[in-house]
């Protein structure tokens, strides 16, 4: 099922997963608009990381801002998975392989700042 959002003559069609992310972000940030914007950004980020390393900016847990190069291509993920992990969406995070640091990372939805 998809949701249509119409605001100021703008139409957005969001999947259920994107709407769920938007609700989580809106609850955490106190802004429905920010929830929708960041949820769409996450959708773009995940789609691009599945194809190639993608550069994005996010706030780390300690509050610092960092540029990341992340990837989730199936071939890499299969080669590096141990089978003991969990889906990032289960805990409202984006999981990815950090190309620069050489390990898995996760970023809370609301901490994604920009996809470059």
Residue ranges of model-derived segments:
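Structured surface patches comprising rigid loops and adjacent beta-strands/short helices at the edges
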Residues: 75-77, 102-116
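A short, Trp-centered hydrophobic/proline-enriched beta-strand micro-motif
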Residues: 50-58
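Eukaryotic low-complexity, non-globular regulatory regions
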Residues: 1-25
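Structural boundary micro-motifs
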Residues: 2-6, 28-43, 57-64
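Short, conserved turn/kink motifs that form compact alpha/beta structural patches or helix kinks used as
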Residues: 60-93, 97-100
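Charged, amphipathic alpha-helical segments
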Residues: 27-44, 69-83
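Catalytic phosphate/metal-binding cores of nucleic-acid and nucleotide-processing enzymes, i.e., regions
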Residues: 16, 52, 62-64
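Terminal non-globular linear segments
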Residues: 19, 25, 90-106
């Amino acid at each position: 099922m998809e949701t249509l959002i119409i605001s100021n003559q703008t139409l957005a069609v969001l999947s259920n997963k994107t709407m769920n992310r938007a609700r989580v972000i809106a609850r955490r940030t106190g802004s429905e608009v920010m929830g929708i914007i960041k949820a769409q950004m996450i959708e773009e980020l995940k789609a691009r990381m599945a194809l190639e390393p993608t550069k994005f900016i996010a706030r780390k847990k300690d509050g610092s801002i960092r540029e990341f190069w992340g990837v989730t291509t199936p071939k890499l993920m299969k080669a590096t998975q141990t089978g003991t992990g969990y889906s990032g969406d289960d805990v409202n995070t984006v999981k990815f392989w950090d190309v620069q640091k050489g390990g898995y990372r996760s970023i809370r939805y609301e901490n994604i700042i920009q996809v470059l």
